[in-house]
């Protein structure tokens, strides 16, 4: 299943796509795979976070998960193996969220090539402004990975135009200025951010940061998709089942009226 097909399927069902985030190797290798099996029936796409020692864009919940996964021996090689195992479980799009440092440490061509071979659909690069290293972005795309970048409510229209020009797959709209984490309510600015992004690209737009339940999911459902991370990781941290939370969030993603249809994107890797 392609990324556009996954978003289109959700839209045909009158809802935003659900994109669960899980940290590779948390709460353990086996626990991670169990969590994947629990979220897959609800997920349209899946985001897997590569644990990193200095996750500047992540809040305390995901920071703790990364620290524990690293202490238990999770590594880039371990994440590769997990992506391969997850790919054997599903045909749904799988996106690897990674900071730039591990990519550079392994060498971009090797890193991207191995994750593509393992079954990743694309990479989310939260700390890479794509116009600062278009060659690296182009390399990922030529290897066959979709490239996803973040935009915030503070992003200017000019900045949005620059970022979406380098993006493939979908565009990640950050609901708040700050780090990941659960919130009781999302700021109203998220609607305007989604509108401004969609005015400049045919790619799907997914909202992340702060979605923790039905109410915040409903707010975020102005977008084509919604990423849920900290709330799921917190549930794993506390030893709770993920199904009740996923059911609640799916209810919030249901729309009374479907958003305007996704246009078939003709975007190709940068040349």
Curated annotation (Swiss-Prot):
Catalytic activity annotation: (1S,2R)-1-C-(indol-3-yl)glycerol 3-phosphate + L-serine = D-glyceraldehyde 3-phosphate + L-tryptophan + H2O
Gene Ontology cellular-component terms listed: cytosol
Catalytic center residues: 47, 58
Identification of the protein by name: Tryptophan synthase alpha chain
NCBIfam families named in the record: trpA
Organism name: Thermus thermophilus (strain ATCC BAA-163 / DSM 7039 / HB27)
Subunit structure: Tetramer of two alpha and two beta chains.
Protein role: The alpha subunit is responsible for the aldol cleavage of indoleglycerol phosphate to indole and glyceraldehyde 3-phosphate.
Entry GO MF terms: tryptophan synthase activity
A Pfam cross-reference name: Trp_syntA
Enzyme Commission code: 4.2.1.20
InterPro entries, sorted: Aldolase_TIM, RibuloseP-bd_barrel, Trp_synthase_alpha_AS, Trp_synthase_suA
Family: Belongs to the TrpA family.
Keyword Endoplasmic reticulum: no
Keywords for this protein: Amino-acid biosynthesis, Aromatic amino acid biosynthesis, Lyase, Tryptophan biosynthesis
Gene: trpA
């Amino acid at each position: 299943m392609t990324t556009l097909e996954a978003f289109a399927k959700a839209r045909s069902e009158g809802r935003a796509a659900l994109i669960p985030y899980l940290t590779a190797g948390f709460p353990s290798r086996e626990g991670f795979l169990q969590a994947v099996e629990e979220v897959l029936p609800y997920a349209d796409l899946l985001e897997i976070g590569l644990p990193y020692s200095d996750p500047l864009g992540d809040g305390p919940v995901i920071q703790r998960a990364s620290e524990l996964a690293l202490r238990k021996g999770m590594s880039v090689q371990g994440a590769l193996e997990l992506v391969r195992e997850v790919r054997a479980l599903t045909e749904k799009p799988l996106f690897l969220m990674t900071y730039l440092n591990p990519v550079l440490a392994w060498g971009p061509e090797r890193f991207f090539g191995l994750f593509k071979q393992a079954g990743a659909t694309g990479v989310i690069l939260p700390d890479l402004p794509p116009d600062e290293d278009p060659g690296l972005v182009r390399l990922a795309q030529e290897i066959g990975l979709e490239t996803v970048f973040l935009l915030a409510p503070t992003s200017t229209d000019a900045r949005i135009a620059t970022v979406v020009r380098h993006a493939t797959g979908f565009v990640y709209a950050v609901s708040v200025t700050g780090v990941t984490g659960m919130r009781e309510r999302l700021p109203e600015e998220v609607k305007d951010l989604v509108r401004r992004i969609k005015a400049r690209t045919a790619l799907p737009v997914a909202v992340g940061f702060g979605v923790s339940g039905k109410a915040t999911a409903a707010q975020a459902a102005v977008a084509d998709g919604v990423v849920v991370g900290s709330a799921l990781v917190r549930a794993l941290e506390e030893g709770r089942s993920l199904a009740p939370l996923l059911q609640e969030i799916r209810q919030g993603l249901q729309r009374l009226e479907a958003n305007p249809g996704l246009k078939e994107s003709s975007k190709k890797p940068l040349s």
